[in-house]
Amino acid sequence: MTGKTSILIVDDVPENLRLLSAMLEQTGHRVRPAISARLALMAARREPPSLILLDIRMPEMDGLEMCRQLKADEALREIPVIFISALNDTEDKIKAFEAGGLDYITKPFQEREVLARVGTHLKLHHHQN
């Protein structure tokens, strides 16, 4: 399954995109970075990814709104979304789950945790489809 999976990473901080991309590419995933939610939605519609790693606080459109739009789209609603954010308040996490996220990782993150969560959700999604 790895190597064939495409992970869309959405974060407005270029350094976060570089770090997450390098981490996931090392494990054989094809990574597609997006600097904004608007660009990420266009990329997802053009070529639906296997999984989305999504920041919350971004200009233009935040990650919660992007997730709501994904879940409202018949063609994209089944894509697993993992939020990855510096917001660590319980209410922020609940809002992310209510928007349609399946998991939530707080920044600063640990590489092994990100890889474990991504791997688990890809396996679950693969078995459900």
Tell me what each language-model feature is.
Residues 2-6, 13-32, 38, 42, ...:
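Two-component/phosphorelay signaling modules centered on CheY-like receiver
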Residues 47-53:
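Active-site beta3 strand of CheY-like receiver
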